[in-house]
């Protein structure tokens, strides 16, 4: 597992997670991956932030199947309507939005994966999601 040594978080990740934690948000990860997800997050130094890990290997489906989103919601005891979601794939962000999440598509390094749909929910930094949450809760 030497590939784990190269995993680092984006620069704004820790500050954004700290902000959400300080505001009392429950935080979870939904990923199309195996149970090694937790090890990956730990290697990035982020494991202390998350209350829930939902991976496709246990869900039996990949995003954007509603089942994986529902498993994550259930694990946190929240509804989609009170949840924020961010993904670097449009189709997965759209899947969450179709279920009632406020869902953002994050574009990293200018790469937008050729999406042709609505661009209203595009962000370029996790700070933008925190700014949105701050505005909505004032």
Tell what function each PLM region has.
Residues 25:
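Switch/coupling loops of ABC transporter nucleotide-binding domains
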Residues 21:
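Conserved ATPase "switch" residues in P-loop NTPase domains
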């Amino acid at each position: 597992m030497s590939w784990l040594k190269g995993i680092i978080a984006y620069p704004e990740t820790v500050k954004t997670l700290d902000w959400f934690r300080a505001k009392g948000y429950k935080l979870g990860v939904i990923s199309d991956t195996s149970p090694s997800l937790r090890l990956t997050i730990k290697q990035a130094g982020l494991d202390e932030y998350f209350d829930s890990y939902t991976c496709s290997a246990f869900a039996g489906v990949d995003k954007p199947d509603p089942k994986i989103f529902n498993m994550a919601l259930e694990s946190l005891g929240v509804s989609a309507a009170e949840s924020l979601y961010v993904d670097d794939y449009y189709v997965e962000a759209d899947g969450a939005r179709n279920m009632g999440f406020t869902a953002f598509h994050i574009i990293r390094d200018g790469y937008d994966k050729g999406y042709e749909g609505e661009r209203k929910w595009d962000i370029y930094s996790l700070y933008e999601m925190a700014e949105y949450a701050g505005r909505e809760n004032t």
